[in-house]
Amino acid sequence: MVLGPVPSSSADAGWWTPTARPQPDSDINVTGEPFKGTDAQGRVRGFVDAHDHIMSNEGFGGRLICGKPFSEAGVADALKDCPEHYPDGSLAVFDMITKGGDGKHDPVGWPTFKDWPAHDSLTHQQNYYAWIERAWRGGERVLVNDLVTNGVICSVYFFKDRGCDEMSAIRLEAQKTYDMQAYIDKMYGGPGKGWFRIVTDSAQAREVVKQGKLAVVLGVETSEPFGCKQILDVAQCSRADVDRGLDELYKLGVRSMFLCHKFDNALCGVRFDEGALGTAINVGQFLSTGTFWQTEKCTGPQHDNPIGLAPAPQAQKELPAGVSVPSYAADAQCNARGLTDLGAYAVRGMMKRNMMLEVDHMGVKAAGQAFDILESESYPGVISSHSWMDLGWTERLYKLGGFAAQYMNGSEGFTSEAARTKALRDKYGVGYGYGTDMNGVGGWPGPRGANTPNPVRYPFRTADGGSVVDRQTTGARTWDLNTDGAAHVGMVPDWIEDIRQVGGQGVVDDLMRGAESYLHTWGATESHRAGVNLASGAAASASSTEWWNPFVDYAPGKAVDGDTATRWASEWSDDQWVQVDLGSAHTVRRVTLDWEAAYGKAYRVEVSTDGSDWQTVSSTTTGDGGVDTVRFAAAPARYVRVHGVQRGSQWGYSLRELGVYGG
């Protein structure tokens, strides 16, 4: 990219320049006006960071991530290490666990920053507000701030200054995000005037981006949302807890969330971590729930990460005497725990509230079951934000209208993966995103070296061409991506330029379309309305009903009562059916079947206008349970029948809900 004249400092005395920035403070090292408006087609432009953790220093007991993203007392107070890291890092236990070695480092942050932040330091603040400002000035226009904590890690970590209740941490992180918005607003003259704008709907976000500012979306990534842990496979929460929790999060401004993260909970099973970290998490799983991860052979091409088997001595010594981490069969790489009934209820609860579901961290069994539910309603609100979803689900996600972002990998790896999925993005007309996962204990791109043949050459122009970026300086420290790697979130513009150097302008162009694609998914999620279920409350009949349990009613009407906690169940033989009378003839195109464990492997969907002459509109011999969505050419029907041909289990057939739709 040919570099033209660098804008003068006087050119920066515009709306984007604060009038009351605290002094001293970090430099931004970007000059020029941030781009505004839309393209010729009315689409917003800009990058989307779909996965960041601005406030994770407030989670995990308050002492896992050291330093704060802002402080009313100034930068020296914000960017200082945890007390136990002084004088030389000898007690930086989490550094030892995540980075290896003895954890020793220079704890001094401001103003020297000798050892942190760094691309391989996982326990120090990377989201100082001025560094986020630099990412915005470099072209980022949407940022998802995932409120995050983990009660298990908090409970076993040696240092903490608060309790470990996850929902308390989530509430605090949400409040701190609003506080940071107010902190930035003060620099620009008052409420609403700053560049950091928390948004609660896609229309607000579009307006913010059109103004050239940063739209901040609140998400949640926690291991036991709403208190939904499991102990010995017994859920510690109820449907009422899920509803109360979702309502509270929505009121806080949260619009996307994960249902499970790192540890199996009462909602779903997770995608495993590998290596020593996986072993440590598996130990934590046992200490929290009384159960280790359980694996099974994968039933499809998707699979979970290989389960962590490497030693993790610091964690393993916490196990009770006589208890050890189990070994796992090499051909069993999938989490046996899928989406629980309570988890399915939570997915539907998010759909009811028009929230976006994050499927990263779900095991493939749970993710597949979640996709089944989303597809039953053609629900577009599904996000993969940082490469933790099996890539075999990507087209399924795009078909629904969802959005995918890649983890902030090194430029070479990032561009290679971007190229691999390019054809899919073009097929569905979508842009691309990245998930920095800063403050997320993940690790970030290291330096490619000053002598690499295609380094970042400072200063350089931003992707839109309107601003100029130089090396970033905070206090006495200056970072260069070529020699330091991505030490903090302010290095995102440098990393984007590195991607351009390695992968070409096309990758950057796809990333510039990311904000539009993310907001399109969000807008479609907000406008989604559940179809009218013609079978709801309709008269139902069946070939038989399971009768030998005198305490539970399995009548056919239970399949159309709108309650997934009830079900119809047949006697235990293959040739069985259940049907509904819609009351009058309708044009139908879709039937949904929410199977209990007793599912149909082979079955037909039949329709009739008179209850005597039946037409088969769809059939299968490969049913696998879960939620089936059966689509077929429009057909007139007053009666709709599901006719079982072959059972998928030793029991009969059992449907929680049978839905019939006109579209």
Regions found by a protein language model. Name each.
Residues 615-633:
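Extracellular carbohydrate recognition and processing domains
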Residues 578-587, 632-636:
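Extracellular and analogous surface-interaction loops
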Residues 1-9:
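Secretory targeting and sorting signals
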Residues 10-334, 341-348, 365-375, 382, ...:
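N-terminal hydrophobic targeting/anchoring segments and the immediately downstream early-domain regions
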Residues 586-597, 642:
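A short beta-strand element within beta-rich, extracytoplasmic domains
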Residues 643-650:
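Short beta-strand-plus-loop segments that form exposed binding edges in beta-rich domains
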Residues 531-583, 594-599, 619-623, 650, ...:
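Disordered, acidic Ser/Thr/Pro-rich linker "stalks" and the adjacent N-terminal cap
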